[in-house]
A protein has these predicted regions:
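A generic structural motif
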Residues: 36, 83-85
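Intrinsically disordered, low-complexity regulatory regions in eukaryotic proteins
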Residues: 1-43, 51-57, 76, 92, ...
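Short proline/glycine- and polar residue-rich coil/turn motifs
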Residues: 66-75
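Beta-strand-rich extracellular modules
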Residues: 82, 97-101
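Short glycine/proline/serine/threonine-rich loop/turn segments at secondary-structure transition edges
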Residues: 85-93
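Exposed aromatic-hydrophobic patches
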Residues: 74-82
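Extended, structured, electrostatic nucleic-acid-contact surfaces
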Residues: 54-66
């Protein structure tokens, strides 16, 4: 079971867009919570892939022999996601489920998240969706100052030598710094246009400068 704020959720969305290009893998950590008493013995947990479009081994790797440690009431189930060019076109999914074994028997399979509507989530299954796509502009890309496009984002990170993850953290890039970055990018593109062989990444698919 995972909580986002105070809300229980049975799904995780992950994108590689904020991960540097040199990094080919990322780990998604799924908390597994015990309902019951902890014991002084480690206990294996039976977690299996039950669906999804991603292929085990090619797109992701599961932990070998997950175990709830002795004395613990929870542990993190860490799935290694593999980066591929296909993720730039569409998302892939993994669906996992906790299954009964000699140590654990499911008692609570769903929990209600909204009493009025009766909306509930599964406590035994979890879906991971991952891609290298943007679902929205980064937190520190101030669209009222300069409209966002993925191409502008990637070019800015490269030219200004800024980690991609910084753009998803408003404490690292203020609106004032963002204004400076945009002015520098406009200047960079203008300088490139004067060259015989300008940086090809300054043009969109129609050949128009992106800044």
């Amino acid at each position: 079971r995972i909580r986002v704020g105070n809300i229980l959720t049975d799904s995780t969305n992950f994108t590689f867009v904020y991960i540097e290009e040199s990094q080919n893998e990322a780990i998604v950590s799924i908390p597994v919570q015990l309902v019951g008493k902890a014991t002084d013995e480690p206990r294996p947990v039976n977690i299996k892939v039950v669906g999804g479009s991603a292929k085990e081994g090619d797109d992701f790797v599961l932990p070998a022999n997950p175990v709830l440690p002795a004395g613990a009431s929870s542990f993190n189930y860490e799935i290694t996601l593999k980066r591929s060019t296909a993720l730039q076109e569409e998302a892939k999914t993994i669906e996992i489920a906790i299954e009964e074994n000699e140590y654990f028997r499911p008692i609570i399979t769903h929990e209600i998240t909204d009493i009025q509507s009766g909306t509930d989530v599964s406590t035994m299954r979890h879906k991971i969706e991952f891609s290298e796509l943007f679902t929205e502009a980064p937190a520190a890309w101030y669209t009222y100052i300069y409209p966002f496009t993925p191409q502008r984002f990637f070019l800015t990170c490269r030219v200004m030598d800024i980690p991609r993850s910084d753009f998803n953290d408003a404490s690292k890039i203020s609106s004032f710094r963002f204004q400076y970055l945009m002015s520098e990018m406009v200047k960079y593109v203008a300088e490139q246009l004067l060259l015989e062989n300008p940086d090809p990444e300054i043009f969109d698919e129609n050949g128009t400068p992106i800044f």
